Amino acid sequence: SATRIDRAGLIVKGRENVILQSNQFDTTWITTNAPTLTSGQSGYDGTNDAWKMEASSTGSSRAIYQNISSSGVQVFSVYAKAGTTDWIRMNLSGVGNRYFDVANGVVGSNGSVDGTITSVGNGWYRCSVLGTQNASSGPYIFIASANGDTSVNTGDNVYIQDAQLEQGLAASPYIETTTTSAQAG
C-alpha cells in the first residue's frame, strides 16, 4: 500500500475500523449479563443514532463486546454520555481496562491500560483505550457505577454511539462499518 504524506510533509496514518456493525449494538455485539440496548437516542452528532445501554438487573459486569481476531497496538474508542450513572469501563481483551467518568470528562484512576477522554459537546465524550491486544475476544464496553466498580442497579444506564477498533496509538476520525470492516485514506 502507498504511504500518504500531508501538506506539511508528514506521514499520515490510514484510518480503519475492524469492528463490525460499529453503531448497531444489537447485531454482532454480544451481551454479558443482558443489558438492554435501545436505539433511536439523541447522539453527539445531532442524529438519533445513539443507543441507551441499561442494566436490566442488579449485579456486576453488564457489558457488550465483539469477538475480533486482531493483534498489535490497538486503540478502541466509543462516544459516550452519562445517563443515570456517570461511568463506563472499556476493556481490551487480554490487555486490561480503564474507567471513564462520562459526566465530568475524567479518565478514572482505576485501570491497567492508557485511556483518553475528549469532549465533543452536549455532554458527549469520545473515550478510548490503548494497548497491545493479543486475544481473539473483546473489546468490551461496560456500564459502571464508579471508578473501579462495575456493580450496577436495575435501570442504571449510559448512552453510547460509534465504536471503533484500529491499529495505532490514537483514535482517528470515526469510520462507520456494517457487515465488513472499513478503511479510508
Locate each region found by the language model:
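Extracellular and organelle-lumenal recognition/adhesion modules and their flexible linkers in secreted
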Residues: 1-185
